[in-house]
Amino acid sequence: MTRYSRITGTGSYLPPRRLTNAELAAELATKGVETSDEWIVERTGIRARHFAAPDVSSSDLAVKAARHALEAAGRQASDIDLIIVATSTPDMVFPSAACIVQNKLGIAGCPAFDVQAVCSGFVYALTVADALIKTGSATKALVIGAEVFSRILDFSDRTTCVLFGDGAGAVVLEASETPGILASDLHADGKHVGILCVPGNVSGGQVLGDPLLKMDGQAVFKLAVGVLESSARAALAKANLRDTDIDWLIPHQANIRIMQSTAKKLKVPPEKLIVTVDEHGNTSAASIPLALDASVRSGKVKKGDTLMLEGVGGGFTWGAVLLNY
């Protein structure tokens, strides 16, 4: 019998501290950095973001999102036989955030590991989980995107520090007799490492070099729109579907301009584009599952809808997952 995988539950979590653009601008002004709500909204579409408390880690956010997803799926943590966490801001150099999440959920024995593809991380992780389920290596997977990007922001650089936020999103992906994940398409091109990176490195327990995020926004924008369209079309082709078959486009929530440009290229009408970047900011690997959970809980996304998830991030990495919800 052919095995498939299907999302059976979604969940998310945002730290309580919400910072509007005006509040962030006021904080930055005390450090001599000028920005404004108008400047940020015009360039990014972002109006607010959430920052985790200093004693809260990515695994803490991940566990809360995971519990919500488990509840939505009608499952207990003990039912899970695979945990994959997509993150670029893990609690420790090692062990993985996934192992820490596993322990906090009170389970043991199942495989647990991290995937690091920055903002493409969730589509990478979902693709890996789908493959493991299809081969019979797992039956019920927790796939989580979790980030505390506030820890790696340079708050003297207004072009980057206003963009990002913290949060986590999760799905329960289960073996199914009917197709849920229809197709996926993943790519990377390492020659673009320098346009979006944290250039520091860890040696002897210390961070050497610059530990804060660096980004060439124009270069990222130029690359992102093209690769997002091509990856989405590749996933559609693998599933023998057309862009008109997409019920909802749920892209990585980085910048409203990139999202709208991609939707236009895919001929997805504005009302079918899921947007949460205005309230969440760019939460990297957490952004797609956060947006998915928000759209499910709001009633926009319904069972049977065809969803296109797509991400692009540092590396340069990009990819798409086409699924029937």
From Swiss-Prot:
Its EC number is 2.3.1.180. This is Beta-ketoacyl-[acyl-carrier-protein] synthase III. Keywords: Acyltransferase, Cytoplasm, Fatty acid biosynthesis, Fatty acid metabolism, Lipid biosynthesis, Lipid metabolism, Multifunctional enzyme, Transferase. The lineage of its organism: Bacteria, Pseudomonadati, Pseudomonadota, Betaproteobacteria, Burkholderiales. It catalyses: malonyl-[ACP] + acetyl-CoA + H(+) = 3-oxobutanoyl-[ACP] + CO2 + CoA. The last Arg residue of the ACP-binding site is essential for the weak association between ACP/AcpP and FabH. The keyword Lipid biosynthesis applies. One of its GO terms (biological process) is fatty acid biosynthetic process. Pathway: Lipid metabolism; fatty acid biosynthesis. One of its GO terms (cellular component) is cytoplasm. GO terms for molecular function: 3-oxoacyl-[acyl-carrier-protein] synthase activity; beta-ketoacyl-acyl-carrier-protein synthase III activity. The active site is at 119, 252, 282.
